[in-house]
């Protein structure tokens, strides 16, 4: 399975430019003949315009589905369409849509952990469900940016579905970029799966986004790694490596669930 990540520099609040630019990056990425293309978090609006966010949002993913559904079908490529600022039932969500090779939307996910230090929770509604899906017979999960800091979320997904890979779409800032690298490596290692992150780059307000999109193997090794600027990276994923690792160290067999039911008061 070959993966491409389109590390995109979007313009804050300029949705027409961002949709056109996303199409341009997709058409560049398909030249590498990938099985799956991945985009970053809230690429349609940037993260995030505070003055007129509601007026800039997609509505029920219509524009996103039209663009990526058509591109995925035309080129026969699975697409993890990052996430978009999106209105559903009158409320704004940070929503990810996933498309198969036929252009069909096979899954969607609303970000469950909103980033309170940047007041995301004042503008967006939090999601309430986890999402897993199949692409080319491989079980996949998706999380969005701040979700990565909650290992319980990823472990719940992997225990329920034994994921082959986890997609992480993000707008992670430069000043904490080393933490992104560490957390991605940890999630891949502890869950014995591929972790594919597509981060953004560029600047919004006073925040610089740090790039470092990457593909980590189930051994925790970076097999593709981006710099700080806009670029497309690609990696070939060895489909048998997770099984080989599990034969040596089977962390899922050796789990002790009776010890893990910890709830705060």
Whereabouts are the PLM-identified features?
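Short polar catalytic/cofactor-binding loops
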Residues: 7-13
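Cys-nucleophile CN-hydrolase/nitrilase-fold catalytic domain and related Cys-dependent amidase chemistry
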Residues: 15, 24-102, 108, 173-186, ...
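Short hydrophobic-aromatic micro-motifs
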Residues: 37, 139-144, 167-168, 196
